[in-house]
Regions:
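Active-site phosphate-binding strand-loop segment of PLP-dependent enzymes
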Residues: 106-178
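Hydrophobic "anchor" residues on beta-strands that sit immediately upstream
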Residues: 1, 75-76, 157-158
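Conserved donor-binding loops in enzymes that form glycosidic bonds
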Residues: 6, 102, 138
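Phosphate-binding glycine-rich loop
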Residues: 28-76, 90, 100-102, 174
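Structured binding elements
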Residues: 95
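N-terminal "arm"/small-domain region of PLP-dependent enzymes with the aminotransferase-like
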Residues: 1-29, 34
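Conserved coil-to-alpha-helix start sites within the AMP-binding
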Residues: 83-88
Length: 178
């Protein structure tokens, strides 16, 4: 059973899609180029930011963030237990340990109460350094950034928004991914 008729959506836009694909293939600028620059400009404007740096996929984007902040071996990265593997795979590739926290059943997003309990548990155990929290805008539902942000501030943790599923959604008037 098809949930969404992708073929009908393609047929409705087929001329425009095919023409743009042919134009891009003919230009042979697959990495960088004017299409990427245009995309980054438009996405930055859409989410209300000056800049946007696009990546090949969300996994690469998260890995760049982890690397930029020096997250690696011995570090704990807290994330919801209901997410796509890409939310934590890059942290694991760099040697960090994911700590899975419960979700709220009404939003499927990171439960701030569970997050704080897991942070306290990791601190009490003493084998990992709490470093970051990955909040996922699961199925387009923004996480509770005010509460999660306050917890991150309290413990000195980096808050990373995994907005791969949240493009177009807003939290308190701010676009996800901004």
């Amino acid at each position: 059973m098809e949930f969404i008729d992708l073929k009908a959506q393609y047929r409705a836009l087929q001329g425009e899609i095919d023409a743009n694909i042919q134009r891009i293939l003919a230009g042979a600028h697959f990495i960088g180029g004017e299409e990427v620059a245009e995309f980054e400009e438009k996405l930055a404007a859409y989410v209300g930011r000056k800049h946007c740096v696009s990546c090949g996929n969300g996994t690469d984007a998260l890995q760049l963030v982890y690397m930029a902040y020096g997250i690696g071996a011995g570090d704990a990265v807290f994330c919801p237990d209901m997410t796509f593997i890409a939310s934590v795979e890059p942290a694991c590739m760099l040697g960090a340990a994911p700590v899975f926290c419960d979700i709220e059943l009404d939003t499927y997003n990171l439960d701030p109460v569970s997050l704080e309990a897991h942070i306290q548990s990791v601190l009490a155990e003493g084998t990992l350094r709490p470093r970051a929290v990955v909040a996922v805008d699961f199925l387009g539902n923004p996480a509770k950034y005010d509460e999660i942000g306050a917890i991150c501030k309290k413990y000195g943790l980096l808050l990373i928004e995994d907005a791969a599923q949240g493009t177009g959604a807003s939290y308190k008037g701010k676009k996800c991914g901004s």
